[in-house]
């Protein structure tokens, strides 16, 4: 017995809580035990994802979401994964003991949609020692590992020898391989199949009775009988095709003469036009080639003139360009002259303003000195006035004091005290504390002398200070000149800078004096440089024309070589005439020979066409007339042999068709009366009971029952006995066997199985020995196998018969063709080919024409070389006189040196013109700059100190004077004497006061007068200053304008600019003269070229016109050739004999055929339209399309599948003989293909009975299933009432509805739909077509209804609905149904899978806590009996006694979530439990 495949393990990599975990799956039940959130559902989700990796189906919801139309956005998968690469892999060992690892790579896709990317893969041949975890991860350390990406996994697996890695781009390919390896129970070809499988898994996972499955149990349990449907479709297609073929044959018979006329006229119409276009195209090509040669010759002839014209045009362009440059230079020179003149006028204005400015500066300096002196005098007057006022004040103070003393002379003590105070003040001021009033007078004399000395000293310092201030004004003047010339410099460096300026002025004067000489030298060098540039241009032009660079030193030698070359070329050009004359004579002889051969080619071509046709038909290379007659004799012998073989094949074919007809009957019986008798007796044919027997068991049962394999099995023979009396319509031998048709076994006979045979003990004294037949026919599988072989053999024979019939007719046509060839073409067919010689002569003619063309080209080339050499010699003659200038290499350097010197001299002249006067003024004042007046501050300080000393001595003298004056106060001899003395003193003081006031008045008057004079001097100074500033601003503006002009002028600048302008005007005049000369020469050259150009234009116009015709016709001709070659009509259209006819004859032939075709296709709209389109002369391809359309029309009408040829002409020849035979054969075939409605009803009925029996067999596996109050589960199959009525009418009342089934307009499916609608008018067929409804009625599944029933408690059998059952009962019932569905799928797919493969069986059950222990035990028993694996999830408190249990505990360690797993074997088994192992996954 074949061992069933098993899932060995499930591996999760990088799932939520599982980094790398492998669950070893039990052979029966694997339990995942754990609390809420332990990871049970995640484990099952990983298993289902690896099994069905379809994101459109996957939706892992918990039980609280059951029935919800929308769950979480990621459908439960995204949240179960970790970031990065994840894997879910299933390890499977199938029936072949192949270890296969199938799984998927999952990866989260970033985004709000929470999508997951899935890639399925497969690893086959992995060694047993390598675990899935080891292959999917890579160990990085003791406690760390890395998940491998899919590409690295592929590379790692492929590195292991003998291991196959395959990645799948589609889920269909993935499931196809899983089906072939026995992983899934059925082939999942489409998304609908995957949806069914997923719904089954989903129903298993969440438990209960799935309405999605119970509502469509027919689709899950009943296999599609595609063979029956395909047989009906093939039958209808064959009948339709047969009827169409018969109709086509009848139409073809009536149109055969028209077709002959149509194809002959179409061939003449299209072939004549085809060959006419081919001839015209060849002629146009020849004309185009001739014109092209003439054009090329004329172009070469014109080339020399064009070269000369181009050279002159180039020289004219250069001269015109030079003229433009000269005009630009001349205009620039004129503009420069205007600028120089403007600058000169501006320079004159600047000079005038500078003179005025210098004069104003001189007057301003003088006025400044006057104002300074006046200001000094004003200061002296102010000082005198201040001293006078001070003296007046002092005298008034003294006088007041004395007056006061006189007023209070009664108070002598006060006076005496005042005297003492005066004495103390004198002591303090004089620093003489011991001085007495008696010593005051001598001391006063001393201080008077000191006052005189201080005054004299002060006057000395004042004189020195005045002298220093006068020197200061000259220093400032000299320093201002230095700053004006050299810019800002320090006062300490002013003297050194002034000396350098004076020295530089001498060198600047020397350079300025050389300006005129340098200008003359510069003009001369510029003129020589222009001459050198002209020489270089001539040399470059000469080298360009000669195509080679020549150094100037070799020009003399080159001139001699050119003169010799011109003489040689002149001699070569004169030797061209004789060679051309000889070539023309040879060309005329070749052309005459070609014309002779053309006249002989027509008859030979017609014979060759006939000979080629014979060679193609016979397959022999006919090279002589003897071979033609021998081949004709062989054809007669081959015809006799083929006819005999055809008759033999026809007999064998009839025999096989009889066998096929017998085996096609229901049950394989060749007697339809047996079916009627079986229905009459209420029994079943033995062959129908064993209709499902496999092909391997068919020989055994065929030998077992022997002659009774067509027996009728009845429940009770005694009931049949009465009906046997008077039975007439029955076979000669009728076998009846008593037994239950629903549970029939083969224990009817005593049987002993032998090697290749059986021994049947019919009775004690009767044995039957039967060998296993070589070709068993017992059972549907055996009959179908035999029918398949017979059908293939019949098809081969039919094809062979058709081939032989065609060969006979082909041989007859060949014999007739040979006869016609011998009579018409045998005399000329084997002569030499005239066209071969014509092709040789045409090649020779082309060579001669090319040789003539080449000769003409060489002659033209020699002439061009001659003209080029002559023009080069002319240029060289112009260049030789300038050779000396051309060889002067130092000219540019000398020019640059002189230009640099001239620019320096020009800068020196401009410098002197700007600063000459300032330098002249500075030169005598240089010495003043040696000492800075700012260094004489000490002198001013000494002056002030002397002034302070004078003032102090004066105060001391005044104090002493006061003491001396008060000395009388020290003696109060008597009051009168004191008053008298005081009166004298008062008078003196009054006199001094008067003198002081007079001096003060004089000083004040002098101050006022001098102040008015100072004001007048200041106004004059301000006026001069304002005028000076205005002129200085104007001078700056003029200088800026001169700078903006950008021209540096000197005395000769205007003369040089005018000279440059005159020189350019002269050069421009000469250039214009040369240009006019060249224009005249060009006009003359163009006049000479007009004749050649007119000729060339005419030739080009003719050539382009001809070429345009060729090119425009090329696209159409290419499309014509493409159509001809693609459709294989070149042999019909390319008639070489028409190539020798004139275009008018071919056009006349085509027009005549067109008139006949218009009448022939008048009734055919398509051909008429195509013919009308083909009359367009601009679209020749449409005639080919018409010819192809005619051939296509003929092929469609004469049925190429009947007349086996690709040529409609040959098909027309075969048609007369073939049509009668095909008519008879097709009529008989239609009778054989027709199927009765009764047969259809029997086939559907038998199929329904077979499936009912199969469902009953499946129910036997559900009898022992019990869950809670449910004692048993079964599937109830019934036939729909409307469909049962349809079957009854088809089998018994078909005569009443023959109007439907005998109609030629309706197919059998359409007739069946019409009958169904007639019997059930209340049923609305909606928008479905009768053909669609009829095809559905041919599917037996639409006749059945399947329901699930349970035997529950006292209620008995009732329909299984979730509302009527407890949760556990519903889970158990639903699980039982799913097991039956899986078993049904396996049986259905057994023929598609390998014989040595028994697929894996596995279902799921989540939340098994809803089942009691007995129900779980029932599930275990069911898994054991059906060899099915089951994965259930249970809470922690449930521990099944069997299978393998995994305890899952989710923990969090260091913020890392992982699942702690402990695997245990069932503790109810006898074997010792393995040690509990725990594997903790830690995320790295």
Swiss-Prot record:
Top-level taxon in the UniProt lineage: Bacteria
Coiled-coil region list: 338-415, 496-604, 781-805, 835-868, 903-1115, 1206-1265
GO CC aspect terms: cytoplasm; nucleoid
GO biological process per UniProt: cell division; chromosome condensation; chromosome segregation; DNA replication
Transmembrane is among the record's keywords: no
GO molecular function: ATP binding; DNA binding
Positions with a binding annotation for ATP: 34-41
Predominant localisation class: cytoplasm
Annotated localization: Cytoplasm, Nucleoid
Gene3D superfamilies in UniProt: 1.20.58.850, 3.40.1140.10, Immunoglobulin FC, subunit C, MukB, hinge domain
Family matches, as InterPro entries: MukB, MukB/SMC, MukB_hinge, MukB_hinge_sf, MukB_N_dom, P-loop_NTPase
Keywords assigned by UniProt, alphabetized: ATP-binding, Cell cycle, Cell division, Chromosome partition, Coiled coil, Cytoplasm, DNA condensation, DNA-binding, Nucleotide-binding
Pfam name, any one: MukB_hinge
Annotated segments matching region Flexible hinge: 666-783
Domain notes: The hinge domain, which separates the large intramolecular coiled coil regions, allows the homodimerization, forming a V-shaped homodimer.
HAMAP family: MukB
Subunit comment: Homodimerization via its hinge domain. Binds to DNA via its C-terminal region. Interacts, and probably forms a ternary complex, with MukE and MukF via its C-terminal region. The complex formation is stimulated by calcium or magnesium. Interacts with tubulin-related protein FtsZ.
Family membership noted in the UniProt record: Belongs to the SMC family. MukB subfamily.
Function: Plays a central role in chromosome condensation, segregation and cell cycle progression. Functions as a homodimer, which is essential for chromosome partition. Involved in negative DNA supercoiling in vivo, and by this means organize and compact chromosomes. May achieve or facilitate chromosome segregation by condensation DNA from both sides of a centrally located replisome during cell division.
Record protein name field: Chromosome partition protein MukB
Biological source species: Sodalis glossinidius (strain morsitans)
């Amino acid at each position: 017995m074949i061992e069933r495949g098993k899932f060995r393990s499930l591996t999760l990599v990088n799932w939520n809580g599982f980094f790398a975990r492998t669950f070893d799956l039990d052979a029966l039940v694997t339990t995942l035990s754990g609390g809420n959130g332990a990871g049970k559902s995640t484990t099952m989700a990983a298993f289902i994802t690896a099994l069905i990796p379809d994101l459109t189906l996957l939706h892992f919801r918990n039980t609280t979401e059951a029935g919800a139309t929308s769950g979480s956005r990621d459908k439960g998968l995204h949240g179960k994964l970790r970031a990065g690469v994840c894997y879910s892999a299933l390890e499977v060992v199938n029936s072949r003991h192949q270890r296969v690892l199938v799984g998927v790579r999952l990866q989260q896709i970033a985004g709000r949609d929470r999508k997951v990317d899935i890639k399925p893969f497969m690893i086959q041949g992995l060694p047993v020692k390598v675990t899935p975890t080891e292959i999917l991860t890579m160990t990085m350390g003791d406690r760390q590992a890395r998940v491998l990406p899919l590409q690295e996994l592929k590379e790692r697996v492929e590195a292991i020898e003998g291991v196959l890695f395959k990645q799948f781009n589609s889920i269909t390919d993935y499931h196809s391989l899983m089906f072939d390896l026995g992983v899934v129970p059925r082939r999942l070809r489409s998304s609908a199949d995957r949806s069914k499988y997923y719904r089954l898994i989903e129903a298993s996972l969440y438990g209960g009775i799935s309405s999605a499955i119970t509502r469509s149990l027919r689709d899950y349990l009943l296999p599609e009988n595609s063979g029956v449907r395909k047989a009906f479709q093939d039958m209808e297609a064959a009948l339709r095709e047969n009827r169409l073929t018969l109709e086509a044959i009848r139409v073809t018979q009536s149109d055969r003469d028209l077709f002959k006329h149509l194809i002959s006229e179409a061939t003449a119409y299209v072939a004549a036009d085809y060959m006419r276009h081919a001839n015209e195209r060849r002629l146009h090509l020849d004309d185009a080639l001739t014109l092209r040669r003439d054009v090329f010759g004329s172009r070469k002839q014109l080339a020399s003139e064009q070269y000369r014209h181009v050279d002159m045009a180039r020289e004219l362009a250069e001269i015109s360009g030079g003229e433009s440059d000269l005009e630009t230079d001349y205009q620039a020179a004129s503009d420069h002259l205007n600028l120089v003149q403007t600058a000169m006028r501006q320079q004159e204005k600047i000079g005038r303003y500078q003179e005025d400015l210098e004069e104003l500066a001189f007057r301003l300096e003088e006025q400044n000195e006057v104002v300074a002196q006046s200001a000094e005098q004003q200061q002296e007057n102010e000082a005198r006035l201040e001293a006078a006022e001070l003296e007046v004040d002092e005298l008034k103070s003294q006088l007041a004091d004395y007056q006061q003393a006189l007023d209070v002379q009664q108070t002598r003590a006060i006076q005496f005290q005042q005297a003492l105070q005066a004495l103390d003040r004198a002591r303090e001021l004089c620093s003489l504390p011991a001085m007495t009033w008696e010593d005051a007078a001598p001391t006063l004399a001393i201080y008077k002398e000191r006052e005189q000395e201080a005054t004299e000293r002060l006057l000395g310092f004042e004189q020195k200070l005045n002298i220093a201030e006068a020197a200061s004004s000259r220093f400032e003047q000299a320093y201002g000149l230095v700053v004006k010339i050299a810019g800002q410099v320090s006062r300490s460096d002013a003297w050194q800078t002034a000396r350098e300026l004076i020295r530089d002025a001498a060198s600047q004067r020397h350079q300025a004096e050389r300006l005129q000489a340098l200008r003359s030298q510069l003009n001369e060098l510029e003129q020589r440089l222009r001459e050198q540039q002209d020489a270089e241009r001539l040399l470059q032009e000469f080298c360009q024309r000669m195509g080679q660079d020549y150094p100037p030193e070799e020009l003399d030698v080159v001139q001699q070589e050119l003169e010799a070359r011109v003489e040689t070329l002149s001699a070569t050009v004169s030797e061209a005439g004789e060679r051309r004359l000889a070539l023309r004579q040879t060309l005329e002889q070749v052309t005459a020979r070609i014309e002779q051969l053309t006249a002989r080619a027509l008859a030979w071509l017609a014979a060759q066409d006939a000979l080629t046709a014979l060679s193609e038909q016979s397959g022999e290379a006919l090279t002589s007339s003897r071979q033609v007659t021998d081949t004709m004799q062989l054809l007669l012998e081959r015809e006799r042999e083929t006819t005999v073989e055809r008759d033999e094949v026809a007999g064998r074919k009839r025999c096989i068709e009889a066998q096929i007809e017998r085996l096609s009957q229901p049950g394989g019986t060749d007697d339809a009366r047996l079916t009627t008798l079986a229905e009459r007796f209420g029994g079943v044919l033995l062959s129908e009971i064993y209709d499902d027997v496999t092909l391997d068991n068919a020989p055994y049962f065929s030998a077992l029952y022997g002659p009774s394999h067509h027996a009728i099995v009845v429940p009770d023979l005694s009931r049949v006995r009465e009906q046997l009396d008077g039975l007439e319509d029955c076979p000669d031998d009728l076998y009846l066997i008593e037994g239950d048709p629903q549970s029939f076994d083969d224990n009817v006979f005593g049987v002993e199985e032998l090697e290749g045979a059986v021994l049947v003990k019919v009775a004690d004294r009767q044995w039957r020995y039967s060998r296993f037949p070589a070709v068993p026919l017992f059972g549907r599988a055996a009959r179908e196998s035999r029918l398949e072989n017979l059908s293939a053999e019949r098809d081969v024979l039919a094809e062979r018969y058709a081939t032989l019939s065609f060969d006979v007719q082909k041989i007859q046509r060949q014999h007739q063709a040979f006869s016609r060839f011998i009579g018409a073409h045998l005399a000329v067919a084997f002569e030499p080919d005239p066209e071969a010689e014509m092709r040789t002569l045409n090649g020779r003619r082309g060579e001669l024409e090319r040789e003539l063309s080449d000769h003409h080209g060489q002659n033209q080339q020699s002439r061009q070389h001659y003209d080029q050499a002559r023009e080069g010699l002319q240029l060289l003659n112009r260049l030789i006189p300038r050779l000396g200038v051309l060889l002067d290499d130092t000219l540019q350097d000398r020019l640059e040196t002189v230009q640099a010197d001239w620019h320096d001299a020009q800068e020196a002249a401009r410098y002197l013109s700007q600063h000459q006067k300032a330098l002249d003024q500075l030169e005598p004042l240089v010495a003043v700059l040696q000492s800075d007046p700012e260094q004489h501050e000490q002198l001013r300080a000494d002056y002030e100190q002397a002034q302070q000393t004078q003032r102090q001595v004066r105060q001391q003298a005044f104090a002493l004077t006061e003491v001396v004056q008060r000395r009388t106060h020290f003696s109060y001899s008597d009051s009168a004497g004191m008053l008298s003395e005081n009166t004298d003193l008062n008078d003196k003081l009054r006199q001094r006061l008067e003198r002081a006031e007079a001096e003060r008045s004089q000083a004040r008057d002098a101050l006022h007068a001098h102040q008015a004079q100072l004001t007048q001097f200041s106004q004059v100074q301000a006026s001069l200053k304002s005028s000076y500033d205005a002129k200085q601003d104007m001078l700056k503006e003029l200088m800026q304008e001169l700078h903006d002009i950008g021209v540096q002028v000197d005395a000769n600048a205007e003369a040089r600019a005018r000279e440059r302008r005159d020189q350019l005007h002269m050069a421009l005049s000469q250039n214009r003269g040369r240009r006019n000369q060249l224009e005249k020469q060009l006009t003359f050259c163009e006049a000479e070229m007009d004749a050649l150009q007119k000729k060339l234009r005419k030739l080009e116009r003719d050539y382009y016109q001809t070429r345009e015709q060729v090119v425009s016709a090329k696209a159409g001709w290419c499309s014509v050739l493409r159509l001809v070659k693609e459709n294989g009509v070149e042999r019909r259209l390319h008639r070489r004999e028409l190539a020798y006819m004139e275009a008018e004859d071919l056009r006349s032939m085509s027009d005549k055929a067109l008139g006949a075709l218009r009448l022939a296709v008048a009734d055919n709209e398509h051909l008429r339209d195509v013919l009308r389109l083909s009359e367009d002369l601009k679209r020749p391809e449409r005639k080919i399309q018409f010819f192809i359309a005619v051939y296509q029309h003929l092929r469609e009408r004469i049925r190429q599948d009947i007349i086996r040829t690709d040529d409609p002409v040959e098909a027309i020849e075969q048609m007369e003989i073939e049509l009668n035979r095909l008519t008879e054969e097709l009529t008989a075939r239609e009778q054989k293909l027709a199927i009765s409605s009764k047969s259809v009803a029997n086939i559907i009925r038998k199929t329904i009975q077979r499936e009912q029996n199969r469902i009953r067999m499946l129910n036997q596996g559900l009898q022992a299933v019990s869950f809670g109050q449910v004692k048993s589960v079964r599937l109830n199959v019934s036939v729909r009432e409307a469909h049962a009525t349809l079957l009854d009418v088809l089998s018994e009342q078909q005569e009443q509805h023959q109007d439907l089934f005998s109609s030629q307009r309706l197919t059998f499916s359409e007739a069946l739909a019409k009958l169904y609608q007639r019997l059930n008018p209340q049923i609305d067929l909606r928008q479905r077509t009768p053909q669609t409804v009829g095809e559905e009625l041919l599917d037996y599944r639409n006749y059945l209804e399947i329901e699930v029933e349970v035997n529950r408690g006292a209620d008995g059998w009732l329909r299984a609905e979730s509302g009527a059952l407890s949760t556990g009962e519903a889970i158990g019932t639903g699980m039982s149904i799913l097991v039956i569905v899986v078993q049904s799928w396996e049986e259905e797919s057994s023929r598609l899978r390998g014989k040595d493969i028994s697929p894996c069986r596995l279902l799921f059950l989540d939340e098994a806590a809803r089942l009691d222990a007995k129900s779980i035990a029932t599930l275990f028993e069911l898994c054991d009996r059906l060899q099915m694996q089951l994965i259930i999830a249970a809470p922690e408190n449930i521990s099944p006694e069997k299978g393998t249990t995994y305890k899952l505990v989710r923990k969090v360690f260091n913020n890392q979530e992982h699942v702690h797993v402990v695997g245990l074997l069932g503790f109810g088994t006898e074997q010792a439990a393995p040690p509990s192992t725990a594997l903790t996954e830690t995320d790295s």
